[in-house]
Amino acid sequence: AEMAIQAIESGHHVVIEKPMALTLADAEKVVYTSLRFRKQVFCVMQNRYSPPSVWIKEMVESGKLGQIYMVQLNCYWNRDERYYKPGGWHGDAALDGGTLFTQFSHFIDIMYWLFGDICNIQTHFADFNHEKLTAFEDSGFVNFNFVNGGMGSLSYSTAVWDKNLESSMLIVAENGSVKIGGQYMNEVEYCHIKDYEMPELAPTNPGNDYGPYKGSAQNHNFVIRNVVNVLSGAPGEIITTNVLEGMKVVDIIRRIYAGKSVK
């Protein structure tokens, strides 16, 4: 956030990798500075461009699913000593922020993008095998309600052995059920919806390969294209993930972490 503010004050538009900040106060400073200097802020949430994400967004907004009853978000990845190396920022509470900020904010963003804000949050956290690697939890269960109706849950862990397991979203709704799965929500695994036939989606780009560990989909080219189109005034082009949406993800994660005690 500090570097983004400095860039804006120097007269530049900015692109901010997730998360845009680690505290709501810092996120608000970015918003205030961007308004004061009339500069655009682009938040990087490239999973919004994956074909399953684009498809489910249209399904929700069109009302084809009807009332949303339940949403279950599961994020099970591997992040071990190959990732949390001594002397780096990974695992540092002040610089990393926690597992939800650095690893899984993409998927919290997708959930917020689809279903809106959450409330009535209940949490349970644990640190199974990262005591010597990080200053925070590696796993958690989170239950909540959606402000717009329905209930949800988030189950996550970086304690998975050796490699990523999955990032998935299961939706139970009035008119049917959907499950999007794979290592980074890259494929539709189940679709059974009233009076609807599932179309064939374009293939999802592979995940970012960092050698000993893997990340989310390689969609950053779409983010950069959006930046260029918006700043060049392309007709109808808007920021894919704007600064207020980036701030909302920070807000949701901070509320999940509020009063956290790790066992």
Residue ranges of predicted features:
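Beta-strand-loop-alpha-helix segment that lines the small-molecule cofactor/substrate pocket
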Residues: A1-R48, G63
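A general structural signal for well-ordered alpha-helical segments in protein cores
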Residues: A4, A27, S53, F107-I108, ...
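Short glycine/proline- and charge-enriched loop/turn segments
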Residues: G11-H12, P86-A94, A202-D209
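C-terminal helix-rich "cap/oligomerization" subdomain common to oxidoreductases
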Residues: E28, V147, R225-K263
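C-terminal capping/lid region of NAD(P)-dependent oxidoreductase domains
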Residues: K39, G66-M70, I256-K263
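Predominantly a Rossmann-like dinucleotide-binding segment in NAD(P)-dependent oxidoreductases
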Residues: N47-L133
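Contiguous beta-strand/loop segments that form the cofactor/metal-binding neighborhood of enzyme cores
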Residues: T102, I108-E187, I224-A234
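Active-site loop of classical SDR/Rossmann-like NAD(P)-dependent oxidoreductases
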Residues: G211-R225, T241
